[in-house]
Amino acid sequence: MAHIQQSMQGALLDTVRGQNSLVNDLAKRRLYDTAVEEFNAKDRRPKINFSKSINEEQTLIVSQAYPEFQITFYNTQLAVHSLAAGLRSLELEYLMMQVPYGSLTYDIGGNFAAHLFKGRDYVHCCMPNLDLRDIMRHENQKDSVATYLSRLKARNKVLPAFQQEAFQRYSERSDEVVCNNTFQCCESNRYSSGGRVYAISLHSLYDIPADELGAALLRKNVHTLYAAFHFAEELLLEVSTVELPTIGGIFSRDGDKINFCFSNESTLNYSHSYSNLLKYVCKTYFPASNRFVYMKEFLITRVNTWFCKFTKLDTYTLYRGVYHRGCDQQEFYSAMEDAWHYKKTLAMLNSERIVLEDHSSVNYWFPKMKDMVIVPLFDVSLETQKRTKKEVIVSKDFVYTVLNHIRTYQAKALTYNNVLSFVESIRSRVIINGVTARSEWDVDKALLQSMAMTFFLITKLSMLKDELLVSKFTLSAKSVHEHVWDEIKRGCGNMFPSLKESLLRKKLISGSAEELEIEVPDMYVTFHDRFVAEYKASVEMPTIDISKDLSEAESYYSALSELSVLENSKDFDLEKFSRMCAINCVNPDIAAKIVVAVLSNESGVTLPFKEPTEGNMAEAMKSGEKDEVLTLGSQTDNTDLTSKSMVISGSLPLCGIASEISCDTFVRNEEINSLEEYHMLAAESVISNKMASIVYSGPLQVQQMQNYVDSLAASLSATVSNLKKLVKDSSVGFQDSLSKVGVFDVRKKMWLIKPTLKNHSWGVVQKFDGKCFLALLSYHNELPICDADWSKVAVSNESMVYSDMAKLRVLRKSIGEMPISVSSAKVTLVDGVPGCGKTKEILRRVNFSEDLVLVPGKEAAAMIRKRANQSGNIVANNDNVKTVDSFLMNLGKGPVCQFKRLFVDEGLMLHPGCVYFLVKLSLCNEAFVFGDTQQIPYINRVQNFPFPQHFSKLIVDETEKRRTTLRCPVDVTHFLNQCYDGAVTTTSKTQRSVGLEVVGGAAVMNPVTKPLKGKIVTFTQSDKLTMLSRGYQDVNTVHEIQGETYEEVSLVRLTPTPIHIISRESPHVLVGLTRHTRCFKYYTVVLDPLVKLVRDLECVSNFLLDVYMVDSVSAXQLQVSGVYLAENLFVQAPKSGDAQDLQFYYDKCLPGNSTVLNEFDAVTMNCSDISLNVKDCVLDFSKSVPLPRDNTKVPMTPVIRTAAERPRSQGLLENLVAMIKRNFNSPELSGTVDMENTASVVADRFFDSYFLKDKLSGCSLGDSGGKNIIDRQALIRWMEKQEKSTIGQLADYDFVDLPAIDQYRHIIKSQPKQKLDLSIQSEYPSLQTIVYHSKKINALFGPIFSELTRQMLSAIDTSRYLFFTRKTPEQIEEFFSDLDAHQPMEVLELDVSKYDKSQNEFHCAVEYEIWKRLGIDEFLAEVWKQGHRKTTLKDYTAGIKTCLWYQRKSGDVTTFIGNTVIIAACMASMLPMEKVIKAAFCGDDSLVYLPKGCELPNIQSCANLMWNFEAKLFKKTYGYFCGRYVIHHDRGAIVYVDPLKIISKLGAKHITDKEHLEEFRISLADVSKSLNNCAYYAQLDEAVREVHKTAPPGSFVYKCIVKFLSNRVLFESLFF
């Protein structure tokens, strides 16, 4: 049922998001009605006032534990154990809810005052005075009654009617309301009116002996007893103290006495009998007589309170016979094995049974014990040699995970130390879904050693028993006993010398001279028991008379059938109808017939409409065939008519709600006719190849208007160009649920690429002659209607509407042949802070009869019309409130209208040229542009189209400021004062509203386990798609919700890499932080500037919040000049320090990494359940369990603790996780990019920036034939670089045909790459993947690209640019040696995450254009291109096969040089390369030196929208390139290896032996040569501190690295 409701709700939400406005309105109305019904249902719940003062967390606990009540938290009373005291009233009301209203009820030990206040005159309270505390409680209840009455008297009020009868009974016959006897001795004999009798017990069962309960209940003829009491499962174990943390209670046990009290409070203890309490928990049947028995049934556990009920059963119902009691002696003796007191009690309980012939078995109901087991822990005293044992509750999954894993250990590896290491590791961290690392099992650290010993003993004995089953022992000089104990002693050592004697005494083993018997102890014990009873009499089960209820139900059913003929009968309020019939004593059937007759106009009473809506009024007042024509007459002047047709005709309009459909259809047809000029227009005539070279002249406003017109043409050009390329490239289709494009094959009448949207307005058509044209499309059965000469049709999301076409047509028509002119109207900018009421001000100032309102979106337009017309007077319509697109697209279709004033809402989000056109075309005298200068401005999403920075400024005549926000809470207003000039104030009463939560990763986000409140917002489109794929609904980006208001907002960031739009000054942060009115919460996976901002707002003092006014202070960077030597000195670094220095430095730079126990991460990922989101792929599950390998080499253990991991083994799960992280879920950040034209422009920029002009002629640039690229020498150069085995594999290759070039193999690297950050503490690092071609393909293309690379590098300006290919550290130093430290420079680094899988079709187009200009053969280039478009990956080791589109393959011949070329081209397209001092590129790393003060574009935005890169631009003092710090000084530069990276490698866990260790040392010593020069250690400290903020001065550790790397013996001391 839940699934059906969820599916219906999802379908309804999909309908709301549709494009049919009428269906949308109906769906929204349905959602609204559903919400109202839910709230009404919740309002009907019983209301409880919770006056005790508790915190927010406790408030949430109470609300979730008792959803049956509508609880109001007043927090007006401070009291001891406030939560427990407040819960007592809720527990009482919950128990009384189970009792039928008005039935005689006995409250055992109850609160008679509470029942009086509720008016329950049918409750009798047994309140015995067992001690002085009971007397005091009784007196307190009397005082509460007296206080209540005196308060009423002081206010001259009388008792409410519902309380009078109860108080009257208490006044006249108090013995019927309360008595001082125990329930067993209660003398009350109130008459029950023939109904059933009930009883409740709220925390009073402890004082009633369990053996007397049944008889006492039967004496009062109680049918059901509902009880509540505190209990903890741990009390069944041998523990002396148990805590109830939620309510703060403590159970303490001493023998049979159990005490209950509250921690940290001076209240008295409550003492009870432990054995009596145990009976209530463990027993199921409580005998009352030889016939009746009360059966206990647990109901639920809420906030440490157990609820149960005892129901009276007649045993004669089952069998005829007599009740008897007997003793099962065997059960008694077996239960008495241990001599503890509580075991005696349980033995007595198990021996005394009621026997049932059906042998029914019942398990105890322990909610906390689900999947929990009791594990024994053993210990031995070294002095007395006495064995001790205790029990603990542990997760069953934890026990089996440990036992199953250590059972795979070989005999030498099965030691106590290894078992303890694994137990400690998986207790601290478990890998969840191959992504997140967190603690999964809550096991006390103090028990780990004892539990490890238990697991070790169990496994050791199990292995010995298995060996005995396989074969018998062969006697030798040693006895069999000695062989076994030698085996155990090798694992245990000398830790437990009396272990053998302890096991013999326990009888776990027994032996003789010739044989050995081993009994493996139970791994754990579960909670269970069996109950058997026997009955021999049989009677009929008593029945309840429900004939009256059935009769009433039948009459209402008949009435409902009568009402079902009504329109919208599903919305008929049956509850109100039933209440009306009950109050007026009316037969429901008769009432239903009257209602149907009235609503069907058959009763003589006419209802013209059901609701006073415009549509129903028009329907009721419209003329019929025989009615006279109704005219307005003299009343026309007094009626506000906005339709010109109404004024002309003078007759009542005949348009209702449905008339909008025909109107919309008419407008669309007219639009198509006006756009016929585009139909069958050649695509080449629309595509512009010179977007980037447009020159504008004239005043700035005229230039902006020209730029806006050109941007529309550029957008249309880019869309047409991409569709043209798509229709030509598509040969084989693919099905993608998120495809934004579509290609239709006319001959096959099928979609080769099926788009997500339907009914596109236009597209690009390819005819059979290969030419492409634009076409306006029509559809039949969701398929386009095509001409006979059409071959294919390409569409995309940009071709859904005629927006750009229509706007471009209107603007060009309005311009004509005359130069563009600017309107003389006065333009006023209303600059308001978020939530200042800009829309409200527009509605207040506008005169809809002569003014025009324009808004960006149709939702905003509908909202303005609704608010303007809410009084019932229709003043706003489609003529005076429009969207900007609608105004521009439909201009000129009707008579020319001149408006007096123009109001543009959110005008700063528009292109400034668009605003000037709106002012000009509206013919207004004055224009008001409402916006926010600090929020998100206009963003140019057409890449390679010029939009200079100065074009973004809107030129106005006057600026008005609004600095009072009506929406933002006070703490957010404090932040606004830092962003705006002038004092920002607020009218909101909400003081504190912001909060944050750092989540463990994207895998944590799930709408079931982690529901988010309010509106869900993200910064990026990729995070939005991730949230939608996770199951969240109604997710938007910050840019999409600008201008909207929500009560609660949940802002989510799932991208761990830096995002340029998240900074304290970012307008995106400002928009995201100012959308809420009550509550804002930020969920992030990393600590970013917004986290710092939210924490600062949480710490603002109340004094500042009361003033809500802060002066803005501009922060200035303190500049300190460095001290440099006059020349590049070499000072030999002394060799000093020890291993502790290396460990200290590592822990300061990366705190916490050295404490991570990640040795068994791969094991826990394979052992635990996993849920992965994968693309379409084929999995061979026969490869899921790899064959075990006997690895005799044990790796050496490093002395230095780092985050290094052990090598991992390949397998289905490990390889699949690596493939998901490295190849799947590629980002989709790019905007609209004209692939071919933009790639050509980028290639031009690449060659102009990096190549020497005089060497261009020396390479093959422009030689498209590529005939001179490959010769014998080029082939020999390539073969010299290959291994002999590679050349040998090519010996049998005939080179007649090519293998499948789109087929790749996939493997993983066994050693994870270390990250120099803290991510290892919460993440599971994925392995690096290698995707490679066969050797045969590499033999053909390897020499080609090797020669192309050689020629390209030979023509590059090596004095300014370094392409890091096969360069030594000395050559890097030489390249940077001419840097001048006296020249102010900016050091830029572009950090790109997910570099390989972010590369899409555009990157391929850029790379192929560069190779083409370098002279590659066209045929081979096309072959290579097709091999990188749609590729198939096969992992034979793991059994995985999948398909990928584009992406950079990590193992083909162009991986390194291709990545280097792409990052260089990316930087060339964004930076002024003609000003660059130095630049270096290597793979995805880049380092650029620019003069100080250069104007830079928005690098991050361009990298996102054009290059699809999640990039972050860093500006530093010193460069960091390929794991090395570039330290420049006054006359040169020195390149230091990253010392932290060297220390991290010293914690390697893959070193097998000393020979391997020596090779490792030599490798590290080679890359660390520069550390021998200590002359520039001070500058190196500054460079390291730029990257790692917590790094201390490190000269001592640099010297220590030199010391250990230079000496073989010292280096060997770092491993053992």
Curated annotation (Swiss-Prot):
Short name of any one Pfam family annotated for the protein: RdRP_2
Domain ((+)RNA virus helicase C-terminal) ranges: 963-1115
Span list, region Helicase: 828-1084
Catalysis: reaction(s): RNA(n) + a ribonucleoside 5'-triphosphate = RNA(n+1) + diphosphate; ATP + H2O = ADP + phosphate + H(+)
Record-level Gene Ontology MF annotations: ATP binding; ATP hydrolysis activity; mRNA methyltransferase activity; RNA binding; RNA helicase activity; RNA-directed RNA polymerase activity
Transmembrane segment boundaries: none
Domain Alphavirus-like MT: 72-281
Annotated ranges, domain (+)RNA virus helicase ATP-binding: 800-962
Binding sites annotated in the UniProt record for ATP: G832, V833, P834, G835, C836, G837, K838, T839
Any Gene Ontology biological process: symbiont-mediated suppression of host innate immune response
Boundaries of every RdRp catalytic domain copy: 1385-1498
Record keywords: ATP-binding, Helicase, Host-virus interaction, Hydrolase, Inhibition of host innate immune response by virus, Nucleotide-binding, Nucleotidyltransferase, RNA suppression of termination, RNA-directed RNA polymerase, Suppressor of RNA silencing, Transferase, Viral immunoevasion, Viral RNA replication
EC number: 2.1.1.-, 2.7.7.-, 2.7.7.48, 3.6.4.13
InterPro entries registered for this protein in UniProt: (+)RNA_virus_helicase_core_dom, Alphavirus-like_MT_dom, DNA/RNA_pol_sf, P-loop_NTPase, RNA-dep_RNA_pol_alsuvir, RNA-dir_pol_PSvirus, Virgaviridae_RdRp
Region ranges (Methyltransferase): 50-466
Subunit-structure text: Heterodimer of a large and a small subunit.
Family: Belongs to the ssRNA positive-strand viruses RNA-directed RNA polymerase family.
Note: This protein is translated as a fusion protein by episodic readthrough of a termination codon. When readthrough of the terminator codon TGA occurs between the codons for Ala-1115 and Gln-1117, this results in the addition of the RdRp region to the replicase.
Protein name listed in UniProt: Replicase large subunit
